[in-house]
Amino acid sequence: MVKQIKDPIYEYVDIDDDFTKVIDMPEYQRLRNVIQTSYQALYPSALHNRFTHSIGVFHLGRKLFASFCKNVKSDFPLFYHGDWKRLEKTFLLACLLHDVGHSPFSHTGEKFYKDNFREEIQKRLPANIELYRDMEHGTGKPHEAMSAIVGLKLIRQLGISEIDEELFVRAIIGVRYEEKNDSDDKLIENITIGMLNGSLIDVDKLDYLIRDGYVTGFNTMSLDVERLFAGYTIADYIDPSASKHKVPAYKRGALSVIENVTFANDLERHWIQNHPSILYDAKLVDLAIASYDSFMKKKYKDALTEKTVFTQKALSLEGYIGQGVPLSLLSDEDIITYLKNGEDQSAEAVWLRKQYFDRSERLKPLWKSESEFSHLEREILGTAIRRSFKAALKAISGYAFFINESEMEKAVEQKKLMEEAALSEDEDLKNAAQTSLQAQEAVIRIFHIFNQFRLDMDLDFKFAFLFVEYHYESNYSKLQNSDIYIEFSKNRVIPFRDVLTVAAVQASEDEKNGYYYIFSSRKNIERMQEKGLDFGREILMYISRNWITL
């Protein structure tokens, strides 16, 4: 029996019995309460969740696989010796379950997962030595590995048969086969893995680009997936050494769509994901999750014996209920409820509650984009100061978010402890303390500069900063090294990098070191405006005059 789900983007999505059983499971329904992005701080309508996204990925996966299978059978009828039906079912289950292991607030919370996923996956597939070996190069992102583990559990629990469990795991975590035996079949299976977890274009990325654009209204361009999918196949490529081999390829009609997908991804990363309001909100969520984790482990220390509450068990319906802990199907609402109920009266929790729910308390950015920052930085700060100050900010970002009197006192106290350790007779401890002390002195200088600036300008000591490791670099640079090929004809298959029509935007070595946002209170911003001063420019000029490079 086929069930239909109404989707605002794809109209109706057909779901067969085995897939319906998966969707009905509590672990899958949990995804209704895991937000897809952190964009709602900037785009209030961005309320879509991992549930709807996963259904969308499943739908696109079915369409892409059907087109690919049809094209390969037509172009190379005897190439694949495996079972296409089994391959399709495995792939579609991976599409459906690829995010089932996401933590609360999606990517913001996944860093709290433990990092021994290779061993955890091996326990569930002990006979797959090849997979264990191939995982030496990585097991994907933390949520991908957790999704593979939870997904495998659900498949077995439901008794779903006629699938390749190893391929299911590989597709979710993006680990391709490296063994060259049965290379024809492995090529098809590796291409299938890339359809879900590719470097530049896959059904996961396509759905989130389309869906994010739909709910935010940030529609950069139309992504014609029908045209893209219709031209996906394999082709004979003759490399520079005159060796001929099969490669995944798109028909030439897909050229414009590939560029559009790359461009849409660039714009979303540059103008949405790294907008200061979104980064600020994500930082608050990050602090809230850490606070929740710490609170739960202290309150239920006898039952919660693992390093963190972010475990596979916490994602299940049973959870820790049997141990007297109100923790199961862990999702966003657990973190929100923790902030709302006020049970945790620690200073940090009280501050977080106020910051998260009262928007008037939030500090505002002094510049709104990386582009604006880069222009100001290049204009005002010399190269030596730029690098030295950025390095100090990067050091402070490990433990401080706010720049205020309280945080400055903590930094001074920490310096005293380092000074004591630097006098230790233990040489290792002494050397480590001396190295840390130099960095700490730069951190304290940052506090002093901001404190003196606010005194000179008659402002409150309320600042915050966020250091952003990412620097905008177009995905076109990745296309230059990608494994995407275009088939112009049977005898002319060209790497996509050779037909690029848009130049890659390259970051300088200095820019690759990251950038930062500085925030201050509305009151401070209004005071500077009353004085007719550009707050961002003034603070960078003050840093330029007073920062001495080490």
Locations of the language-model features?
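Histidine-centered, transition-metal-coordinating active-site segments
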Residues: 1-93, 100-550
